[in-house]
Regions:
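N-terminal cap/lid segment of alpha/beta-hydrolase-fold proteins
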Residues: 29-56
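Short, surface-exposed "cap/lid" segments of acyl-processing enzymes
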Residues: 55-57, 61-92
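Alpha/beta-hydrolase active-site loop
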Residues: 84, 117-138
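Conserved alpha/beta-hydrolase
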Residues: 84-111
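Primarily recognizes the serine-hydrolase "nucleophile elbow" in alpha/beta-hydrolase
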Residues: 134-189
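Accessory cap/linker subdomain of secreted extracellular hydrolases
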Residues: 170-241
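Short beta-strand/loop motif that positions the catalytic acidic residue
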Residues: 246, 252-254
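Catalytic active-site module of serine/aspartate enzymes centered on a nucleophile-bearing elbow/loop
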Residues: 287, 293-330
Length: 330
């Protein structure tokens, strides 16, 4: 009986599995993760640099985390462990784009830089992003700097773009409304009338730049005296205005199922800066995963690092970074 030399389905599956494993190992061996630090006036910040192997300079993305004590990987004690920024860095590296993600001052490895939240401010976060960006711009391994901000990090990216020397910017789930307006709208949906009136009194005072010592216990988590200096600095900001003055290529990425930053924010950013590209990703939520629309059905994704990022997210960002190189003539 002649021997059949045609591969059987089982053989094909085994071959494909082997090729997948070999390809994965090859990719892993050509991507290096290196520690990087930035000295500031209040201590040292620490981050992770992910660099794909290349004989020529590559683009580098500075990943800027969102609000609260969010670490370099996108994890937050209150907001879940989902590795969103770590996974985004890996996607970029597989596509030949380096990235730096870092622990914000007062967080994780950077905890000794401004350990007291009374000394935090938007301006300090912006200065940090500028410092990281300038450090990356001086590195001969990289030819372009792209700021990639998530949520509040998108505002920081817009404010830091000019002095960091950024060549392009990506806003993921970036807010557009003045922060005081956003806070008031969120509280109006959650607080009973008496507490809402108290919160509006405190908010109005903070908007005027005046701290409030008298904060009722139910509102301490948001308006505790130690966080008020930071809130005052945040309430000064108008994200749409900051985005409007960008003079570099910009991409707005927004998920259709984002329960924290609605699609209307992306539309306002686009109106503020008509030259920016807009990518709406159906089904993507605030932590960059594809989920159902109801909030209760999204909660698990905030604490699931195994859940993959929305595929379209990486595709849009990689395509933009490559096309912005052509706009910059590089």
């Amino acid at each position: 009986m002649p021997v059949c030399h045609y591969p059987t389905p089982i053989m094909l599956r085994a071959l494909l599995l082997s090729l997948t494993l070999i390809t994965g190992l090859a990719q892993a061996s050509t991507i290096r993760q290196l520690p990087l630090s930035l000295d500031t006036d209040q201590g040292t910040l620490y981050g992770s640099l992910l660099v794909p192997q290349s004989d020529t300079p590559v683009p580098v993305a500075l990943l800027i985390a969102g609000s609260g004590p969010t670490d370099r990987d996108g994890n937050n004690p209150a907001g879940g462990h989902n590795d969103a920024l770590k996974k985004l860095a890996q996607v970029l590296a597989r596509n030949g784009i380096a990235s730096l993600r870092y622990d914000k001052r007062g967080v994780a490895a950077s905890s000794q830089a401004t350990p007291d939240e009374r000394n935090l401010s938007v301006e300090r976060y912006v200065t940090d992003a500028e410092g990281w960006g300038q450090q990356l711009k001086r590195d001969p391994r990289f030819d372009r700097l792209i700021l990639v901000g998530h949520s509040e990090g998108a505002l920081i990216a817009s404010l830091a773009a000019a002095r960091s020397g950024a060549d392009a910017l990506v806003s993921i789930a970036g807010p557009a409304y003045p922060i005081g307006q956003v806070l008031d709208a969120q509280l109006a949906m959650r607080l009973p009338p008496a507490q809402l009136a108290q919160s509006r009194r405190i908010l109005a005072s903070l908007i005027r730049g005046q701290e409030q010592a008298d904060v009722p216990e139910p509102l301490q988590v948001l308006f505790r005296p130690s966080v008020q200096p930071y809130l005052i600095s945040l309430l000064r900001q108008n994200p749409a205005e900051a985005f409007a003055v960008l003079e570099i290529p910009a991409l707005i990425v927004q998920g259709g199922h984002d329960a924290q930053v609605g699609v209307d924010n992306a539309e306002i950013l686009k109106q503020a800066n008509p030259d920016a590209e807009l990518a709406l990703i159906p089904g993507m939520n605030h932590v960059m995963r594809i989920t159902p629309l109801p909030w209760q059905e999204q909660l698990a994704s905030y604490n699931d690092p195994q859940l993959p990022l929305a595929r379209a997210l990486g595709e849009h960002i990689v395509r933009f970074i490559r096309s912005s190189a052509e706009q910059n003539g590089r």
